[in-house]
Amino acid sequence: MGELFRSEEMTLAQLFLQSEAAYCCVSELGELGKVQFRDLNPDVNVFQRKFVNEVRRCEEMDRKLRFVEKEIRKANIPIMDTGENPEVPFPRDMIDLEANFEKIENELKEINTNQEALKRNFLELTELKFILRKTQQFFDEMADPDLLEESSSLLEPSEMGRGTPLRLGFVAGVINRERIPTFERMLWRVCRGNVFLRQAEIENPLEDPVTGDYVHKSVFIIFFQGDQLKNRVKKICEGFRASLYPCPETPQERKEMASGVNTRIDDLQMVLNQTEDHRQRVLQAAAKNIRVWFIKVRKMKAIYHTLNLCNIDVTQKCLIAEVWCPVTDLDSIQFALRRGTEHSGSTVPSILNRMQTNQTPPTYNKTNKFTYGFQNIVDAYGIGTYREINPAPYTIITFPFLFAVMFGDLGHGILMTLFAVWMVLKESRILSQKNENEMFSTIFSGRYIILLMGVFSIYTGLIYNDCFSKSLNIFGSSWSVRPMFDIYNWTEETLRGNPVLQLNPAVTGVFGGPYPFGIDPIWNIATNKLTFLNSFKMKMSVILGIIHMLFGVSLSLFNHTYFKKPLNIYFGFIPEIIFMTSLFGYLVILIFYKWTAYNAKTSEKAPSLLIHFINMFLFSYGDSGNSMLYSGQKGIQCFLVVVALLCVPWMLLFKPLVLRRQYLRRKHLGTLNFGGIRVGNGPTEEDAEIIQHDQLSTHSEDAEEPTEDEVFDFGDTMVHQAIHTIEYCLGCISNTASYLRLWALSLAHAQLSEVLWTMVIHIGLKVKSLAGGLALFFIFAAFATLTVAILLIMEGLSAFLHALRLHWVEFQNKFYSGTGFKFLPFSFEHIREGKFDD
């Protein structure tokens, strides 16, 4: 059915790689990205494998590159990305790479260490400069006789009486500004008020040499008397992480020190600038190549990690690997192996042998940028079983269509389409930017899904004739009120006296026929609008749901045919399709029949389909108030119900009984027993050897029909079949009801849109003055914001999730088992894209 409708045919192959060529061959296979290696050493510890040292060396180089990258980003230097895909370095080149990275790392560490020491020295000199400047102001203030009274508490009364000369000690330092209040309280309490503290803020913040952050600090000077207070003050300063600096006592000494400090600061600033320039040059040179280095190192690491999955023969000259690969790509894989052998200079070619296996191969569905998003929707439910029907190509149409049935609005569909078209047109630019925003990346990866959802929403919006809750009168309404004036003698008084009047479509000229496309715009102003639309959308939901489920059941036939399971066709597919069509397919026929059999004149006598369908199961036909739809209805409905009931034992009993009979017959005829020696014609040991051109088994799942060695358990088979039968029969009812969400979501979206129009934009349209025009500007902004936030994003997400549910449960469970595992080829693609995470 083609590569899109069914997963690729896979084969298990064995590779024989010469030791000197293994690295280059695996490198070429990584560039190709078409093989998935199997681990042939599952019981060997990861630290005991052959190439563990090479992997560690690659990890060490990777660590050094991450350090360099961190420094580059810290310096706000852009990393150059030319999109280049460098070739994998040879193993002998690893030494040069290690030496280069070691040199860059050591150089950066040395620069950082020197720069940190210089900055710390610069900080100390800067703080000392401010201390000398501020303390001079403090001492000038202390010379003021008015301050003598403030400092009198530092002197004992007896000493003041004796006229002893005043001998005060002091310490000066710098402290973080936010610690000043606590620092001051601690000094006061510990020293009992016998110290004098003066502090002044440093206007400019100072750079912390360790963190690089800018910190606001203050200069302080503390006066005290005696060694005991001096020790207490120093301990408090140490506890608050204050930096203390020596400060001369005389103004002349302070002036000379300040001059020397300024000179040293100027010299140090020059050295710092030169150091920073050198650091920038090193980082800029590294920024030009770091992406290429990352790719090279990650490729080498991936190759050695893959080589650790291989076996080594006893001669130590050959590596043996097992890979899953698509059959269609065998030639390109052979060519890649030849190319790798040539690059390595080996004279012995690498060998690829296909193997026979009963193991289930991985599932590989080829995708492009358009089908990728839809395949992800399917894979999110479960990876398809090998070679079963792939729902993705059908989902491309059904998913956006069912979404649009719930979301249908012309205006909202246009907005969604425009957004998707913008992403599609700008996809190359957006991809090159490598946006790391996870939410935007998710939306961008589904740009084609959003595009189709928007296009289908425009289509369903035209059918509903709904654009921002308003109808478009494109072709002119088919309804006319004029004949009601002629036939029923309506007058102007009739219009004034009756707030609501009903048009009679049975009157000639009132209804001129169906609207050319979609729903007549006159229904937008009708009071019974919801009654009409609910009936239409409910029946439409049932019809679409039953067709969708019948299509899913029909797809199961292709699976049964491909996997050669005739029992599933005779005792699964046929009764399932009969059961669904005899009950729910008949309901669809009744809906279409009622639409065509009754017109405006006879619609009053139209019976209720709901009551008819319920009576069909109850075999109740005595209700005279609900007339028959057609002659012979009773007999046909009784026949259909009986047929549906007969399908239940057909699905439940026949398959287990046939399987049991086949098992007993095989057990009786499959082997003979002569003297306790079992004789048979099973495969020999030689048949299981590696062969070059064998064909992989079509279906390697657990077979439906047990082999002669398997013990057939009739009880388990019966229970399994009973579960399947009950699930299908009840699922037909519940799944049909589940499709009514199409009607419910469509109704909710239309009502929300109408409420938003009435409660927001209509307010601005009602005001006829100039102020109303000005108010409309702001009201429209609110209307646009609410439309995008509620109706496009929230309602769109809700409809998206409901469409997911309808596909995962109601559609895919009819034919899709989803019990496989994904094909994960060894590929350098993610490394090339800059996704360096393992």
Curated annotation (Swiss-Prot):
The keyword Nucleotide-binding does not apply. It is a multi-pass membrane protein. The modification Phosphothreonine is found at residues 250, 360. It comes from the Eukaryota. The keyword Phosphoprotein applies. InterPro entries: V-ATPase_116kDa_su, V-type_ATPase_116kDa_su_euka. Keywords: Cytoplasmic vesicle, Hydrogen ion transport, Ion transport, Membrane, Phosphoprotein, Synapse, Transmembrane, Transmembrane helix, Transport. The modification Phosphotyrosine is found at residue 364. One of its GO terms (cellular component) is clathrin-coated vesicle membrane. Pfam families: V_ATPase_I (PF01496). Residues 1-388, 427-441, 556-573, 660-725, 811-838 are cytoplasmic. Residues 408-409, 472-535, 595-639, 751-771 are vacuolar. GO terms for molecular function: ATPase binding; proton-transporting ATPase activity, rotational mechanism. GO terms for biological process: pH reduction; proton transmembrane transport; vacuolar acidification. Its main location: membrane. It is found in: Cytoplasmic vesicle, Clathrin-coated vesicle membrane; Cytoplasmic vesicle, Secretory vesicle, Synaptic vesicle membrane; Melanosome. The chain crosses the membrane at residues 389-407, 410-426, 442-471, 536-555, 574-594, 640-659, 726-750, 772-810. Subunit of the V0 complex of vacuolar(H+)-ATPase (V-ATPase), a multisubunit enzyme composed of a peripheral complex (V1) that hydrolyzes ATP and a membrane integral complex (V0) that translocates protons. V-ATPase is responsible for the acidification of various organelles, such as lysosomes, endosomes, the trans-Golgi network, and secretory granules, including synaptic vesicles. In certain cell types, can be exported to the plasma membrane, where it is involved in the acidification of the extracellular environment. Required for assembly and activity of the vacuolar ATPase. V-ATPase is a heteromultimeric enzyme made up of two complexes: the ATP-hydrolytic V1 complex and the proton translocation V0 complex. The V1 complex consists of three catalytic AB heterodimers that form a heterohexamer, three peripheral stalks each consisting of EG heterodimers, one central rotor including subunits D and F, and the regulatory subunits C and H. The proton translocation complex V0 consists of the proton transport subunit a, a ring of proteolipid subunits c9c'', rotary subunit d, subunits e and f, and the accessory subunits ATP6AP1/Ac45 and ATP6AP2/PRR. Interacts with SPAAR. Belongs to the V-ATPase 116 kDa subunit family. This is V-type proton ATPase 116 kDa subunit a 1. It comes from Bos taurus (Bovine). The gene is ATP6V0A1.
